[in-house]
Amino acid sequence: EVNPRSSRTVPFLSKATGYSMADIATKCILGESLKDQGISIICPKEKDRWYVKVPAFSFSKLNDLDAYLSPEMKSTGEAIGYDKKLTRAIYKALIASGMNVANYGTILVSIADKDKEEALPLIRRFYQLGFNIEATEGTAKFLRSHNIKTRIKQKLSSGSTEILTSIRQGHVNYVISTRDVDIASQQTDGYKIRRCAVENNVTMFTALDTVK
């Protein structure tokens, strides 16, 4: 198998530009130049049109797999959204990928110590938009110390199941869960929270740059 690392990018660009790049490239290989094919080297820019592709994952079909996205993780598919506005194109792509996008509700936050400072302005933004913030004890204390009203949820390791029950009953709209890189156990609270979110189709973020 030869994979030039463009198996998904080329189809995306073909849809966005209207040019069948695989056909064009094949003809070039066979000796037919772009000029002979009547194609300009520079594709004409389409005015006021944004195309966005987002990854799609199959965590719900893979039992016991941690939904944390490590650097080597690869998506199992992609979805495309397009619109005259970038924000709407992103929104459409997220919806097409199967993500539930809510404008209000409750966010459950479980942030690794190394990520707390970076996460602070993101959580504050959700709070300012009117979202209810729930967090495990350590994260909740950190957010409260920065004047973000946060409801404390008991850790699973303490014997409580209130977090999982809340997710299963549809009381949580988003889960933001990051982990310490040296902790990968399936016995951790974070792992169990992420699996519960996946199994109940709750939108989850494991990387802060995605939240941004």
Give residue spans per PLM region.
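Short glycine-rich anion-binding loops that position phosphate/pyrophosphate groups of nucleotides
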Residues: 5, 112-114, 179-183
